[in-house]
Amino acid sequence: MKYLLIALGGGTGSLARYLLGTAITSRVGARFPIGTMVVNVSGCFAIGLAMTLLTERLQPHPYWRLALVVGFLGGYTTFSSFEWETYAAVREGGFWIGLANVLGSVTLGYAAVWFGALLARR
């Protein structure tokens, strides 16, 4: 059952990302990736809201976290997971771990995109 919930959530999140991102880009233009930014930032808000509610206030069945966070937000954006993990590290006193996560993820992520594009062009 948990795999089905993750898959359904992931498919729904991916579709939501595509629909929202393309709707914004079609209205604003593609010069700056505002559609992706809106998706990523809204995903960050959603994971902050969802994880806090699910772990501190509501404490529902663990399947809710799988469907909403791992599934939907995982399909919607992985950026939200990255930001939550950074937030959690800083909140628990690991400022330098959080900073290293931000700098490392952005730097390595950019380098990976650059390298992948380089390989694809060969």
From Swiss-Prot:
The chemistry this enzyme catalyses reads: fluoride(in) = fluoride(out)
- Asked if the keyword Transmembrane helix belongs to this entry, the reply reads yes
Which HAMAP family did the record assign? Answer: FluC
Q: What does this protein do?
A: Fluoride-specific ion channel. Important for reducing fluoride concentration in the cell, thus reducing its toxicity.
Q: Which family does it belong to?
A: Belongs to the fluoride channel Fluc/FEX (TC 1.A.43) family.
Which keywords, in A-to-Z order, does the entry hold?
Cell inner membrane, Cell membrane, Ion channel, Ion transport, Membrane, Metal-binding, Sodium, Transmembrane, Transmembrane helix, Transport
Record localization: Cell inner membrane
Question: Which membrane topology term applies here?
Answer: Multi-pass membrane protein
Summarize where Na(+) binds, as residue positions. Answer: G74, T77
Recount the known activity regulation. Answer: Na(+) is not transported, but it plays an essential structural role and its presence is essential for fluoride channel function.
Task: State the organism of origin.
Answer: Solibacter usitatus (strain Ellin6076)
Determine the domain of life of the protein's source.
Bacteria
Q: Which GO terms describe its cellular component?
A: plasma membrane
Q: Which GO terms describe its molecular function?
A: fluoride channel activity; metal ion binding
Q: One GO BP annotation here?
A: cellular detoxification of fluoride
Transmembrane regions listed in the UniProt entry: 4-24, 34-54, 66-86, 95-115
The cross-references to InterPro entries, in alphabetical order and at most eight, read: FluC
Q: What is this protein called?
A: Fluoride-specific ion channel FluC
